[in-house]
Amino acid sequence: MDYSALCKEILNMDSKIRFAGVCDETGDVKYGGQREGVPNLLTQEETKKSMMQALGRWGLRNSLAPKIGKGKYAMAEYEKIKRITFPLDQEHLLLVTTEVDADHTKIINNILNKAE
């Protein structure tokens, strides 16, 4: 899968999407990034820390996969953003952030259809 193209497609999906990035198992964002003209709320270092935390949570979720199936996505809503993570493969995680008023159900469904 072309992760750069996927991130571009995601950013073009909805103007309420702030960030679409793919990180590797080290937490480094390898593809994608912030929507042009939208200010970052986190520094690059904080983004990496956030990615590492997300990777850790997905590791915990995957430990239950044999019993309940693989996770498709996880979402958290904060005061300033919504944050959605999608496991892409064993080594890559997709992080998408949106504005709080974004239609996250529509965005999640569109991303799941593209990432399959």
Give residue ranges: language-model regions.
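Non-catalytic interaction/Regulatory regions outside core domains
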Residues: 1-116
